[in-house]
Design a protein with these regions (language model features):
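A short N-terminal helical cap/helix-turn-helix that marks the beginning
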Residues: 10-33, 50-73
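AMP-dependent adenylate-forming
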Residues: 36, 58-85, 196-207
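Conserved adenylation A10 loop of the ANL superfamily
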Residues: 79-81, 238-250, 266
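Structural core segment of the AMP-binding/adenylate-forming
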Residues: 127, 131-215
Length: 314
């Protein structure tokens, strides 16, 4: 029997014991009292009574051992740019974004819609939401206004985080006009729109609603934003299905179970170790991007490579 077969057999023979062991891969502010509650199957509850935070486990807990280690590499073959962030630098950027969101009125349990290209600020926004207990809903960048409007109406975000434009296959895709039209079509009206200006396209602002990320980022420098400890079963994000088989459906992920499953997969599926680098050819608008561009590698203490471009075009 191979090692992977042995692990699989153990998980089937004693699921509660197995997952209790895997739960030690992350930090818990409050220990869980029950690994698995299947009393309302198939609506299983994981790590009942435990409290944790995705951002803490992806960023903060690594600072003591690897603050200077690379955490996020960003490469854009679209704009011929590259940036890298250590765990300490990532912590600073995420803290700033969290302070901005709080300054715009976002509280625990609020939804934040992220409609962005593959740029570091998109990851900052996701982690910042996790930090303060907000629920992010990432929409694939460049989605048409009608599709975006449907997700705005369903998620009902307090704040939208977006950018002037993305670039794909050498073509600039202006996001702001698509977003403005989507909000015009929506019954729900977000209170604020936070905008990252990449200077790729014109970005007219709507007074009283649109906010400049760069200005806010300077304003909140040095502000400390503690992690909000969430019950294991509280939602971490909502991600919509593509809609190819009907109306898009919002799929909600919990916090504790998701973190433990990801941390476990990084070793047993990907053989990832702290200090390694992982590249996942996906987009944060899809679940693979959530799990294996942003959260999974960081939970494992690895560096993640975020790529703006298409895998088939250099």
């Amino acid at each position: 029997m191979t090692a992977s077969h042995a692990v699989h057999a153990r998980s089937l023979a004693d699921p509660e014991g197995f997952w209790a062991e895997q739960a030690a891969r992350i930090d818990w502010e409050t220990p869980f009292r029950q690994v698995l509650d299947n009393s309302r199957a198939p609506f299983t509850r994981w790590f009942v009574g435990g409290r944790t935070n995705l951002c803490h486990n992806a960023v903060d807990r690594h600072l003591a051992a690897r603050a200077g280690q690379p955490a996020l590499h960003w490469v854009s073959t679209e704009t011929d740019q590259a940036r890298s962030f250590t765990y300490a630098e990532l912590h600073d950027e995420v803290s700033r974004m969290a302070a901005i969101l709080q300054g715009l009125g976002v509280q625990r349990g609020d939804r934040v819609l992220i409609y962005m290209p593959m740029i570091p600020e998109a990851a900052f926004a996701m982690l910042a939401c996790a930090r303060i207990g907000a629920i992010h809903s990432v929409v694939f960048g460049g989605f048409a206004s009608v599709s975006l409007a449907a997700r705005i109406d369903d998620a009902r975000p307090r704040v939208v985080v977006s950018a002037d434009a993305g670039s794909r296959a050498g073509k600039v895709v202006p996001y702001k006009p698509l977003l403005d039209e989507a909000i015009r079509l929506s019954s729900h009206q977000p209170e604020k729109v936070l905008l990252v200006d990449r200077q790729l396209a014109d970005m007219p602002r709507i007074a009283g609603r649109d906010e400049d990320y760069a200005a806010w980022r300077e304003r909140v420098a040095g502000v400390q934003v503690p992690c909000v400890w969430l019950e294991s079963g509280e939602p971490s994000y909502v991600l919509y299905t593509s809609g190819t088989t009907g109306k898009p459906k919002g799929v909600q992920r919990d916090t504790g179970g998701y973190a433990v499953a990801l941390a476990t997969s990084m070793e047993y599926i990907f053989c990832g170790k702290a200090g390694d680098t992982m590249f996942t050819a996906s987009d944060i608008g899809w679940v693979v991007g959530h799990s294996y561009i942003v959260y999974g590698p960081l939970l494992a203490g690895m560096a993640t490579l975020m790529y703006e471009g298409t895998p088939i075009r250099p």
